[in-house]
Amino acid sequence: MALQCGIVGLPNVGKSTLFNCLSNAKAQSANFPFCTIEPNVGVITVPDERLNKLAEIEHPQRVIPTTVEIVDIAGLVKGASKGEGLGNKFLANIRETDAILHVLRCFDDDNIVHVDGRVDPVRDKEIIDTELQIKDLETIDSRIAKVQKQAQTGGDKQAKIAYEVLCKYKEALEQGKSARTVSFDTKDEQKIAHDLFLLTDKPVMYVCNVDEASLSLIHI
């Protein structure tokens, strides 16, 4: 099964443009918010020289490279965790992915609308982070309500472990930290944490959308 990466960010930051570049697709990309409503999906192959070397040795009938599924998800706005914009749908789409490509607009252009009026990639990152953290906190609070009594009054060992995991996540999220910053030592804890499918536990890569004039200023 292919790894699925979701492209996320505020509206009008270049998500569909990135999707088209990666997948060679022709998804609509326009200068207005929520140009994308239903997710666009594309599949790209992953070049791997090791695969070619193995093929030279084994001479298989077919060589099938690894693929990555790229999903262009509708733009998120402040308040999405409470249903603003396409909030609930957007968050459900993210939950289905394995990793996140977070696009940040880092260029000024008066001809391209910014939903918050001005370009500020740090603020934009924090908006997305906060909305995902709030949604994760709702998930944690709901789970705590289900296991707390069982963990505190019963003899269910797994319920006690789950309760401790949930409380650790709750503490971090209430401090504005993402779930991926929390670590667990035992396999039981790690399994419970994994099965929560928290949005902020997914690995994330930040993609900075800059203008051509800024390319010469970038140092890798």
What are these regions (language model features)?
Residues I218-I220:
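Conserved small/polar residues in nucleotide/adenosyl-binding loops
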Residues S81-M205, D211, L215:
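Phosphate/Mg2+-binding loops and adjacent switch elements
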Residues V8, V207-C208:
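Generic beta-strand/beta-sheet core signal
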Residues M1-K78, E84, N88, N93-I94, ...:
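Conserved G1/Walker A P-loop phosphate-binding module
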